[in-house]
Every structure is written in C-alpha cells, then in structure tokens.
Amino acid sequence: MSASGLPFDDFRELIRNLPGPDLGAERAVREREVTLTKPAGSLGRLEEIVAWLATWTGKRTPQVNRPLVAVFAGNHGVTAKNITPFPPSVTAQMVENFAAGGAAINQICIANDLGLKVFDLALEHPTGDITEEAAMDEHTCAATMAFGMEAIAGGTDLLCIGEMGIGNTTIAAAIALALFGGTAEDWVGPGTGSTGELMQRKLAAVRQAVALHQPHLQDPLEVLRCLGGREIAAMAGAILAARMEKIPVIVDGFVASAAAAVLYAANPEAIDHCMFGHVSAEPGHRKLLAKMGKEPLLDLGMRLGEGTGAALAANIVKAAALCHSGMATFEQAGVSASK
C-alpha cells in the first residue's frame, strides 16, 4: 500500500506508469512479413495481429504456446430489484458447471486447446445494491483488483478474460453510462433475457444508481467501486497484471469490456495491449467499443459471456502467430518475389 494508506493510490500510480510498446519488435515483425511467401498485405488483419503480439510481448517472432481463459464470477446486490429472469444462485451453479466441464466455454477451450481457470469471487456475499449504496468500499475493490492480478500467476502468453454473474449487464451498463454519458437506454440491453417490466426495472436501476453516486463518478476507480462488481474489479486487475508481465489480452464481451473501459478512462493507453475478441449482441457493447476506438475480431451474434468470444478469437491470434513464424520466405522456398 502507498504511503498515504489509500488502497487505490497504488493502482493510480500503476495505471499512470505502465510499460510501453516494444517498437523494435513490431518493426522486426513488419520487416519479416514482407518477405513471406504471399502478396504483401494478403493476410489482412492477421498481419496486424502478429505485429500487435510482437509489440506487447517484445518478441520478434511471437508465439502463443500457453493461452489461458480466466473466468471471474461474482454476484450483485442489485438483483434484489428483480431486473433479471434468473436468480443469483445461477452464478454458483454455473461455476459448478464450469468445474464439471459442462459449459460452452469448456467446449471452446477443448476445441482451441486453451487452458481454463475459474475464479469464484465470494459468491455468498453479493456486492451492495448500487441503487442504494456503493457496490464496494475502497479496500474491498482494491483487494479484488489485486486478487485478479493473480490470474496470470501460473504462467500464460495470451490471456483471455471473461465473466459469469447474474445481473452484471446491469452493472456494465451503469459503468458505461457513468464513464461515457448518454442515457440508460443507450447502454441497457436484455442481458440474460430481460424484457417488458424486467427491462423497465433494469433501466430504472441504472438511472437510479448513476444519479445516487454522481458526486463520486469523476474518478474511474470510484466508478468501479460505486457501480462495479467483484468480477469486474478482478478483470481490471488481470488486465493490469498482464500489461506488467508483457502478456497480450483478449477481452470478451460487454461486461469484460466495461472492466477495460474503467482502465481506459483512467489512461487510454492502459488497454493498448488488449484486443477485443468479439462484439456482443448486447446492444451497448458496440457503442462501448466505439467509445474506446476498438475494433472487435468477430461478430457472431453471441451474448453468453463466460469468455466464449475471447476464446474463439484466441484461435485467430494463434493462427496469426503461426503464419508469421512458420511460413517460408520467398528466398527459403525458391519462390519468385513480386517486382
């Protein structure tokens, strides 16, 4: 903890002083790219992906050998406002399903040869109801960010982050509204299937929460504390830890992007090592990506969460790295280069 004793101070300092890009590694990748047996630029965005990998790993021949999906699960007091068709007990039940191998993310990890870790964030203790009180105090929020930083402890060279938490699209919408303005209608979507009266209650909850905490919302970390959730705080911590350790990150959908948005609002360069795996069918996600100037890799109409979109995108990143490292040059293959 910093000398001032305030838990957020260390994170503010970290966010201000993040390691920058390795432009030498990026340059080396781009120089090799034009020598490979293909017309220049013909692999399109794959060529940009491998340059991004080099930039943030510092490796001139980037590889992805230990990709990991980290799924963070949290519960939210605001679900007491009857904003979702599923009870909060489903969060713990889905964590058990992940452990048993029965969820969509398990199958995608098997198909794409990805590691999977699931983090249960005090599910028996939901965060505060954001329409009545702050989600967390500063100590809890900072400690949860620090816990999220441990996601990379076992070693990985590509981190995919996702989440599970009944009610957390409401939380993500409140964060987006607080950070980027607009109206609740701009950010609130159906989530797990809220329609009709449920949707109206969800909209009302977001409006009420942002109005209640307005005096604190000039500071992005205070936005996280007042309106966030444990899984969102942990994802923000994981993104920061990955940056410190030169690990590129693939962010999943709307809720995971809300965690990235907190860091972006504090320092737009804080998420330069992040790629966004897909754009969710949750309507606020496309707007959120646009606010951060990010282009998703995939658009498959998905809105499940669990890290599924990030995990699917990981295979594209793996393929980009292999194309760069494994392809022969024109000289090696005896193929005539373009004039």
From Swiss-Prot:
GO terms for biological process, alphabetical: cobalamin biosynthetic process
Catalytic reaction annotation: 5,6-dimethylbenzimidazole + nicotinate beta-D-ribonucleotide = alpha-ribazole 5'-phosphate + nicotinate + H(+)
Top EC class for this record: transferase
Pfam families given in the database record: DBI_PRT (PF02277)
Single GO term (MF): nicotinate-nucleotide-dimethylbenzimidazole phosphoribosyltransferase activity
Key words of the record: Cobalamin biosynthesis, Glycosyltransferase, Transferase
Record EC number: 2.4.2.21
Active site: 306
Pathway field: Nucleoside biosynthesis; alpha-ribazole biosynthesis; alpha-ribazole from 5,6-dimethylbenzimidazole: step 1/2
InterPro entries: Nict_dMeBzImd_PRibTrfase, Nict_dMeBzImd_PRibTrfase_bact, Nict_dMeBzImd_PRibTrfase_N, Nict_dMeBzImd_PRibTrfase_sf
Function: Catalyzes the synthesis of alpha-ribazole-5'-phosphate from nicotinate mononucleotide (NAMN) and 5,6-dimethylbenzimidazole (DMB).
Family (UniProt): Belongs to the CobT family.
Name of the protein in question: Nicotinate-nucleotide--dimethylbenzimidazole phosphoribosyltransferase
Lineage: Bacteria, Pseudomonadati, Pseudomonadota, Alphaproteobacteria, Hyphomicrobiales
